[in-house]
């Protein structure tokens, strides 16, 4: 056996000599083989081989320790050199190394064992040599070439094979390999606590258990996705948090490319594809607008984007704005004449500051300029047209902008709607004003202005913006302005109110100085409750009533007036189970509320000269006067309603007498307040103040015909004040033309009743109050183009307006046919309307003949008046309204006398007869225009009323204490309801109005009572100025004395050839 092992010792020595350079420096390896070398090859060490051993042909490869490419390396780099040198002198078998060095080398290093192909590895010391068998086994069994040992086929079944998979199937693969086998990439047997390999290698067997799944191999698409993900993370850090909420809802896709060469499984799976899951959402996201959602807005994104794209409110309408100087001037006019009287809108310091900075929306500036232009005297703003139409061009632009944004509520548009409604109210456009008011109310509720909110409701819940005191007060005042507009516009008989008092849960406005200087203070609600009471230690004024100013009590006064209107005109009186004179009736409750409201005013708001001066210094005197006028008007309105109950059974005399006293006291008080305002030059410009003056005037008309001399004198003086105020208001608010006409009608009815002396109490009917909102029915479409005094002609109904109604018959009766034919008068009016402006300046033809019939005379006067008045009228163009012009009447223009006999009796110096001397161009300047407007008719006995003695020459010729010729007192036999409702008394009038139809101008009562028609004696009185003393004569011997109607000149009296006032258009020539 030994001889076979060493049969060719030369060949063995040559193979060792051809080894690597690693062992060249070891002399023992190159010497003659020692006995230990022969012992190393002894067959006893290979007893496991089953066949004879003939020697290895390539034995040098077994003992080769390094590759030829690494022969240049230093031997010191290999610590195995000492091991091999010791191996030559030891008696250990081939392949056996000391265990001490092996364990020390394996345990002293944490690095993995070197690979056997590495140049630093030693095949003799590689622990993997045990993988092919134990040390007692021979190498000739083929395991060195990768073959399996015989025992592998008969090895027991591994323990892990008994485990099942999650699906319950038999496991074919090892679930987990140890760390050593994983590093060497060999198959692990999986035994625990140590696998076979680790037992052979005598190393520690460790199984690393982890829950993290292995990451997939990074592909090309994933490699491109990494920088995109990093860039996305950077962008997310820059995006605001509010927008991250939207971005977080979109899941970022993770793209996994398909492995090339693989075929997708045809088996149906439970998981859906990416297209099926994310396809619709991705399409919607791709087609959505690119702009993000507006912050602080919960409306649908489509509306937000649409509004954002055409967000022109900040600069839309800028081309129609006037100059900066006019804007600031009209803003001051607005806060001096409109603010606080109609509505408490806008915060003046904020508005003026934004106006100077140019940050106000043009639509708001246009609206303010439109409503304020009527009150300015600036020549850059005023035009040849009437005052109330000066701002119509600006209003039309503002209204177009507002109507295009009706579905987007905001405070700016809402404020513009309220102011535009007031402007259209003044131009007699009732349809527009009514519609704008309703639109504003709906928008206010949409903005939740009826709730006292601390945060802006338009913001999102996550970004609530707390409102400041000024902003909360502005919201409250806008809502109260909507409430007032609803009460004003719904005061008519057929116009119910929309806003209920219990729906407004906000406090009343604070004092004006608190609002201007940003001083928070608690106030009461409309029902008297305090929503947010404070203690005196909070730094605020604790008394809520003291914190309320003029605006708060004005709102309470108008709210009470609305309840009175509901009771008297909208069915509340019929629902009252008790008669009004009973203590349990609703009427008595309203009466007590009216009286208690005035008594509940704080000391700073009670009327006195001192408080009026204080408010004048604060520039709120007009508001202070307007509030007290409204309080007195409530007393007048509710007290006068009791006059209709005096005919009923069971009424107490005290009830009627107290109501009568309260009515006259309130009417006189209103006139005193108007006179006080005129003396202080505090113009009360609120339209409702004009209605209060109108109601007071109707009471003064009844006082003039009273048998009480003191009441009569007071009524005459107060009537003069009221009528003068109404004529002044007529320039700014068009509906006062209608009110003046109604006052004229009532006054003529009172004079007719006084002259007739007939008892009309038996013919009295239920009184019909003229409501503040009734002008809507009188002026549905503004004023007429030609006269500017008549309501606009009713347009023919559109044929499509009755499309949903029943089909009517197309046949006409004879009466209906003739009613459609135009009358000669209407034809003349049409010719007058169609006449051009140059033709209107031609002089009217004189007519000296007496008409045969009174009716014919009236028609001729009306046609002549239209030509005469047209000479002085100029029409405004380009304003965009139906009423393109108005009468600018010159009160110094005189007419030709229609009665030559009467004209010769007038003094040649009388200004009323100046046209008789047309060649004289001089007109006395000491006659005020108001006096030239007076026209005196005749009474029953030729006496002059005491009030007019200071006005007329010859007015002191007779004693006025005789009163009427028969000494009859006119209060008896005269029903208040008859006069107020316009009922005509019969008897004593001799049918003078039987041939005259009632018209809008009021000439039906004008000419029938004049001296030129009735044949009575003409008056010798002529005007004297207020600032001149009456002549010191007792009687004029040259002229006949005639009775004078004291207010015929004011309301269109008899036809004496003087200038008489027209009911709506001002004064009008009464001559041929």
UniProtKB/Swiss-Prot annotation:
Zn(2)-C6 fungal-type transcription factor that has a role in the establishment of the fungus within the plant and/or the progress of the disease. Regulates the expression of virulence factors such as SIX1 and SIX6. This is Zn(2)-C6 fungal-type transcription factor FTF1a. One of its GO terms (cellular component) is nucleus. The lineage of its organism: Eukaryota, Fungi, Dikarya, Ascomycota, Pezizomycotina. The gene is FTF1a. PROSITE patterns: ZN2_CY6_FUNGAL_1, ZN2_CY6_FUNGAL_2. Residues 178-205 bind DNA. It comes from the Eukaryota. It is found in: Nucleus.
């Amino acid at each position: 056996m030994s001889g076979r092992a060493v049969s060719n010792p030369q060949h063995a020595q040559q193979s060792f000599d051809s080894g690597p350079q690693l062992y060249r420096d070891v002399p023992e390896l190159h010497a003659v083989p020692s006995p230990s070398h022969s012992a190393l090859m002894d067959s006893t060490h290979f007893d496991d081989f089953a066949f004879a051993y003939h020697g290895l042909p390539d034995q040098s490869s077994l003992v080769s320790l390094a590759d030829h490419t690494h022969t240049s390396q230093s031997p010191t780099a290999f610590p195995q050199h000492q091991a091999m040198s010791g191996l030559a002198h030891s008696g250990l078998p081939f392949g056996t190394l000391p265990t001490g060095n092996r364990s020390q080398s394996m345990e002293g290093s944490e690095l993995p064992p070197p690979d056997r192909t590495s140049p630093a590895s030693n095949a003799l010391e590689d622990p993997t040599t045990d993988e092919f068998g134990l040390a007692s086994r021979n190498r000739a069994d083929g395991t060195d070439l990768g073959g399996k040992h015989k025992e592998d086929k008969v090895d027991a079944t591994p323990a892990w094979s008994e485990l099942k998979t999650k699906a319950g199937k038999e496991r074919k693969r090892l679930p987990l390999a140890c760390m050593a086998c994983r590093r060497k990439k060999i198959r692990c047997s999986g035994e625990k606590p140590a696998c076979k390999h680790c037992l052979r290698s005598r190393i520690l067997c460790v199984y690393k258990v982890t829950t993290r799944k292995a990451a997939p191999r990074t592909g090309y698409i994933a490699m491109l996705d990494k920088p995109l993900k990093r860039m996305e993370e950077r962008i997310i850090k820059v995006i605001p948090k509010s927008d991250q909420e939207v971005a977080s809802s979109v899941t970022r896709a993770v793209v996994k490319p398909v492995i090339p060469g693989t075929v997708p499984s045809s088996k149906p799976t439970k998981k859906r594809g990416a297209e099926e899951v994310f396809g619709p959402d991705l399409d919607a996201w791709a087609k959505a607008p690119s702009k993000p959602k507006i912050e602080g807005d919960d409306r649908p994104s489509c509306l937000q984007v649409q509004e954002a794209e055409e967000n022109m409110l900040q600069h839309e309408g800028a081309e129609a704005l006037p100059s900066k100087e006019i804007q600031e001037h009209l803003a001051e006019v607005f806060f001096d004449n409109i603010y606080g009287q109609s509505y408490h809108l806008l915060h003046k310091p904020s508005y003026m500051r934004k106006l100077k900075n140019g940050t106000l929306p043009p639509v708001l500036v246009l609206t303010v300029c439109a409503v304020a232009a009527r009150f300015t005297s600036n020549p850059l703003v005023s035009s040849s047209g009437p005052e109330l139409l000066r701002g119509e061009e600006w209003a039309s632009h503002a209204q177009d902008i507002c109507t295009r944004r009706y579905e987007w509520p905001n405070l700016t548009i809402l404020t513009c709607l309220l102011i535009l409604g007031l402007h259209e109210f003044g131009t007699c456009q009732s349809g527009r004003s009514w519609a704008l008011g309703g639109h504003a109310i709906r928008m206010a509720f949409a903005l939740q202005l009826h709730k006292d909110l601390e945060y802006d409701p338009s913001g999102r819940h996550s970004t609530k913006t707390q409102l400041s005191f000024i902003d909360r007060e502005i919201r409250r005042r806008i809502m109260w302005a909507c409430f007032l507009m609803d009460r004003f516009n719904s005061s008519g008989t057929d116009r119910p109110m929309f806003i209920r008092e219990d729906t407004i849960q906000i406090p009343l406005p604070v004092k004006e100085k608190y609002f201007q200087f940003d001083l928070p203070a608690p106030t009461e609600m409309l029902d008297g409750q305090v929503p947010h009471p404070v203690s005196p230690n909070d730094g605020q004024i604790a008394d809520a009533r003291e914190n309320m100013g003029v605006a708060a009590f004005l709102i309470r006064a108008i709210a009470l007036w609305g309840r009175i209107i509901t009771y008297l005109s909208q069915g509340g009186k019929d629902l009252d189970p008790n008669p009004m004179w009973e203590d349990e009736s609703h009427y008595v409750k309203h009466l007590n509320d009216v009286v208690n409201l005035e008594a509940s005013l704080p000391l700073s708001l009670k009327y006195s000269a001192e408080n009026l001066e204080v408010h004048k210094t604060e520039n709120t005197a007009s508001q202070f006067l307007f509030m007290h006028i409204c309080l007195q008007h409530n007393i007048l309105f509710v007290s006068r309603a009791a006059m209709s109950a005096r005919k009923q059974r069971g009424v107490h005399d005290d009830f009627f007498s107290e109501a009568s006293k309260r009515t006259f006291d309130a009417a006189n008080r209103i006139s005193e307040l108007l006179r006080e305002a005129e003396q202080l030059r505090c113009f009360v410009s609120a339209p409702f103040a004009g209605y209060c003056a109108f109601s007071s005037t109707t009471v003064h008309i009844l006082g003039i015909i009273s048998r009480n001399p003191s009441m009569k004198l007071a009524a005459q003086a107060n009537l003069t004040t009221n009528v003068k105020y109404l004529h002044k208001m007529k320039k700014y608010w068009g509906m006062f033309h209608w009110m003046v006409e109604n006052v004229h009608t009532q006054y003529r009815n009172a004079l007719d009743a006084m002259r007739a002396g007939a008892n009309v109490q038996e013919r009295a009917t239920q009184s019909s109050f003229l409501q503040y909102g009734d002008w809507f029915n009188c002026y549905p479409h503004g004023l007429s183009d030609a006269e500017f005094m008549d309501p606009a002609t009713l347009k023919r109904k559109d044929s499509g307006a009755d499309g949903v109604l029943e089909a009517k018959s197309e046949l006409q009766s004879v009466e209906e046919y003739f009613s459609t034919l135009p009358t000669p008068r209407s034809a003349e009016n049409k010719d007058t309307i169609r006449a051009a402006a140059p033709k209107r300046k031609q002089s009217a033809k004189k007519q000296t003949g007496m008409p045969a019939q009174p009716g014919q005379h009236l028609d001729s006067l009306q046609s002549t008046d239209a030509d005469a008045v047209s000479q002085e009228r100029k029409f405004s163009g380009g304003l965009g309204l139906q009423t393109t012009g108005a009468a600018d009447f010159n009160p110094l223009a005189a007419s030709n006398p229609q009665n030559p006999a009467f004209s010769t009796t007038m003094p040649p110096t009388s200004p009323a007869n100046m046209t008789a001397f047309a060649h004289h161009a001089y007109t006395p300047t000491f006659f005020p225009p108001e006096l030239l407007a007076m026209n005196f008719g005749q009474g029953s006995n030729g006496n002059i009323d005491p009030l007019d003695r200071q006005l007329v020459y010859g007015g002191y010729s007779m004693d006025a204490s005789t009163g009427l010729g028969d000494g009859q007192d006119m209060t008896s036999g005269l029903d208040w309801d008859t006069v107020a409702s316009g009922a005509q008394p019969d008897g004593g009038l001799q049918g003078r109005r039987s041939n005259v139809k009632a018209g809008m101008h009021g000439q039906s009562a004008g000419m029938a009572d004049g001296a030129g028609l009735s044949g009575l004696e003409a008056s010798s009185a002529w005007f004297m100025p207020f600032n001149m003393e009456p002549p010191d004569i007792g009687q004029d011997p040259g002229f006949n004395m005639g009775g004078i109607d004291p207010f015929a000149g004011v309301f269109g009296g008899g036809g004496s050839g003087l200038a008489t006032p027209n009911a709506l258009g001002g004064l009008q020539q009464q001559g041929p």
